[in-house]
Amino acid sequence: MTDGDTKEWTFSHSLAKDATWTPGLREIFEYRDLGIKAGTKGDHVAHLIRHKGKKMTDEVQQWHVHDCTFQMVYVMNGWATFEYEGHGQKTIRKGDCINQIPGIAHREIACSDDFEVLEIVSPADFKTRIVDAPKALAAE
């Protein structure tokens, strides 16, 4: 099945033996691009994200949102605790999956040193914005 939006996509095959891990959005993590961003001409991105043992506070511990239309996180290893507007704190562990709805305010509370996830986001070049704490939490 093809249409005008996907006919320019290309087939990709990301081999584990050729994997390269690079810096990305957060200094405490390294990222492995799976070729989906290039293959879909930026419509989607899929990457593995893993903790590299660095300890530091960064903007993700602040309330923030991602300007995207889809974001899915599947935990490959370890755990992390996030707080979500309207949903409270959620700890995700190996094998867990989150459909993080567009525009939901959230923040990271903590993560394990072996935390690793598969993240798929649309569009590929989404932006992250720091926001005020949700009103219900700010009133507490």
Task: State what each model feature region is.
Residues 48-50, 96, 106:
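Hydrophobic/aromatic beta-strand elements that line small-molecule binding cavities or substrate pockets
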Residues 20-63, 69:
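A short glycine-rich, His/Asp/Glu-containing loop-to-beta-strand
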Residues 86-103:
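Short acidic-glycine-tyrosine-enriched beta hairpin
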Residues 56, 78-83, 97:
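Short beta-strand segments in beta-sandwich/barrel cores
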Residues 2-15, 107-140:
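Double-stranded beta-helix
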Residues 48-51, 65-82, 120-123:
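Short, conserved beta-strand element in jelly-roll/cupin
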Residues 36, 51, 94, 102, ...:
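Active-site donor-binding loop signature of nucleotide-sugar glycosyltransferases
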Residues 85-87, 110-111:
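Conserved catalytic-core motifs of eukaryotic protein kinase domains, centered on the activation segment
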